[in-house]
Swiss-Prot record:
Keyword field contains Secreted: yes
Modified residues (Pyrrolidone carboxylic acid): Q1
UniProt subcellular location: Secreted
One GO BP: positive regulation of smooth muscle contraction
UniProt protein name: Caerulein
Residues modified as Sulfotyrosine: Y4
Tissue specificity annotation: Expressed by the skin dorsal glands.
UniProt entry keywords in alphabetical sequence: Amidation, Amphibian defense peptide, Pyrrolidone carboxylic acid, Secreted, Sulfation
Amino acid sequence: QQDYTGWMDF
């Protein structure tokens, strides 16, 4: 899943 910024949500 990705975060709101586009980075991967760890």
